[in-house]
Amino acid sequence: MRANLIEIFESIQGEGFYIGVRQLFVRFAGCNLNCYYCDTPKTSENCLDLTANRTLKNPVSAEYVQGRIDSSKVHSVCFTGGEPMLQAEFIASLSKTHPFYLESNMTLPEKAKKLKFCDYVAGDLKVREAGLKNYDEVFQKTVKCFKVLRNTRRRKTFCKIVLPDKFDADEVLNSAYEIKNYVFGFVLQPVFGSRVEKILKLQKRMIDFADTRVIPQVHKYLGVR
C-alpha cells in the first residue's frame, strides 16, 4: 500500500483542544475542496521526512510510515492534509502502535466509515465564506461525517470552525447546532491575522449549547511547523 504525501515530521499540535501534545504528523497530498485560506500545497513529487532529514519519492510505502510511527515518542499520530480521508485505505492499513488523530474537512462520509478506529477526530465545519462550490451539499456531507465519526467513550471528536473577518454568525450558529450531539466541543479558529471581536460574540451564543473555545493557530505564533 502506498500514498502520496507532502511531509512527515514531529512537532506539537498547534490547533484545537489538544494544543501542545507532541505528535508525528503525516501530511497527505490532495484535497477535494479549495478553501481560499488554505496554505498547504495539493501535490508534490517528493515527500520530505523533516525529522529523519530524508527526501522520499511519492508514493510513499505504508512500511516506511509504519516504521516512523513505531519509532516515534509521541502522544499520537496526526493524519492531516490536504485531505487524509481521500487515502483512507492507506491509513486503515497501518497498525496503531500510537493513538491515531485524524484532521479532516469532513466532507467524505463513505470514506469516514473506513476510519472509525481513529482515537481522535478534529473535524472541520466549513463556512459559506470559505468560497466552496455547492456549499449546501458540502454541509450535508459534513453532518453525515460527524454522525459517522461522532464522539464516543473510545473516540474523542471535536469540531473546528475556521472563521474569516466576514461570516454569517446566525448561519454558523445554526450549523453548529445541527452537529452538537456528535462532538464534545467546538473550536472557533480565526483565519491567521483576522480580527476576533465578532468571533467572541459568536462564542457567547454557542456556549449555551456546547463547550466552545476561541483558539488561534498557536504553532504560527511559536514559529514551529
From Swiss-Prot:
Positions that bind [4Fe-4S] cluster: 31, 35, 38
Domain of life of the source: Archaea
Cofactor: [4Fe-4S] cluster; S-adenosyl-L-methionine; Mg(2+)
Coiled-coil positions: none
Gene Ontology MF terms in the entry: 4 iron, 4 sulfur cluster binding; carbon-nitrogen lyase activity; magnesium ion binding; S-adenosyl-L-methionine binding
Domain Radical SAM core: 18-225
Pathway(s) of this molecule: Purine metabolism; 7-cyano-7-deazaguanine biosynthesis
Annotated binding of Mg(2+), by residue: 40
SUPFAM superfamilies per UniProt: Radical SAM enzymes (SSF102114)
Function: Catalyzes the complex heterocyclic radical-mediated conversion of 6-carboxy-5,6,7,8-tetrahydropterin (CPH4) to 7-carboxy-7-deazaguanine (CDG), a step common to the biosynthetic pathways of all 7-deazapurine-containing compounds.
SUBUNIT field: Homodimer.
HAMAP family: QueE
Similarity comment text for this entry: Belongs to the radical SAM superfamily. 7-carboxy-7-deazaguanine synthase family.
Listed name of the protein: 7-carboxy-7-deazaguanine synthase
Gene name of this polypeptide: queE
